[in-house]
Amino acid sequence: METQELNNISSQVRRDIVRMVSGASSGHPGGSLGCADFLTLLYFEVLKHDPSNFDMDGKGEDVFYLSNGHISPVWYSVLARSGYFPVNELGTFRKLSTRLQGHPSTDKNIPGVRMASGSLGQGLSCALGTAVTKKLNGDSSLVYTLHGDGELQEGQIW
């Protein structure tokens, strides 16, 4: 993918973030906006994944865990823009009884989400467990995780 195309997607992701947080009058726009380029590059260029065939096991594909779940707006936007669910669902962010809440959750059956995040630091434990499992199963695909600076100073990581 060309750099300009990635820049265009990242710019759209930023617009999505502002719309979601503004529409909900709630959320964490700073961390989300700051990670737009990283997650865009990860999902559109680096990660080996198949949005049309998502399953919780992730066998034979790269896996991503968002540990600092409060930046869910950026992840929801990138997931939608890369084909995991319809982009128009972004308008339901933090609305009652919808899937896209302030922290991603597995009980909402959001394609692309393999871990409920909110307990700071647990993403590292899940990523390590997944990496060991992949290695034991002869699966050479990679595991990625993203953590916030604040969570690195508390919880399981600290």
Q: Predicted segments — roles?
A:
Residues 10-26:
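N-terminal capping segment at the start of a domain
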Residues 4-5, 26, 148-151:
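Alpha-helix capping and helix-loop boundary segments enriched in small/acidic/polar residues
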